[in-house]
Amino acid sequence: KLIESNAKRLNIPVTIFESDIFESVFNVEKSPCYLCARMRRGHLYSKAKELGCNKIALGHHYDDVIETILMGMLYGAQMQTMMPKLHSTNFEGMELIRPLYLIREDDIKAWRDANELKFIQCACRFTDTCSSCAEDGQSKSKRLEVKKLIAELKKTNPFVEGNIFKSVENVNLSTIV
């Protein structure tokens, strides 16, 4: 209902559909977030094709991008990023776009508040805003952990976020193993 209410307030047509993704990944211990994201994207591509669309738009923003870069390095032992636009390899003729790619999370929250909107949080137990806390009150969310690390780094380097973002564009291949 919250999504429908926001869409109505902004005069945006919306199509809501159900899936069993959360139940499918709930008991997966290794990489449930990755699996869930892949499954959600697959469902979105399928529904978009069914509706005659050739693109899906995701709400990832600048802060998501820099957190993903660090998460890949620190927890996945790889250099990776989110791209603002992708051509699907599994759904012919489909594209994924991230229109908020360069928008800061705080700016999105300010816009939300100025427009008196309410955002839903992920219904998953692994996210930083839901039931992802251990018994000692510490979050098990790697994204929240990285978000806190970035906040600490900003205390001594105000350019750290921009540097992380640019790091995947400024790769010196002659120094890579």
Predicted regions and their residues:
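ATP-dependent adenylation/nucleotidyltransferase module used to activate substrates
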Residues: 1-79, 83, 106-114
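Domain-wide signal for the mature, well-folded portions of proteins, strongly enriched
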Residues: 4, 13-14, 70-73, 138-144, ...
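Residue-level detector of family-conserved "landmark" positions at structurally sensitive sites
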Residues: 16-17, 58, 121-124, 129, ...
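Catalytic cores of large soluble enzymes that bind and process phosphate-bearing ligands
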Residues: 36, 138, 156
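Conserved active-site and cofactor/substrate-binding residues in soluble primary-metabolism enzymes
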Residues: 39, 141, 159
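AMP-forming adenylation/ATP pyrophosphatase catalytic core
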Residues: 39-40, 86-93, 169-177
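Catalytic subdomain that performs nucleotidyl-dependent activation
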Residues: 63-145, 149-150
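An accessory alpha-helical subdomain
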Residues: 145-172
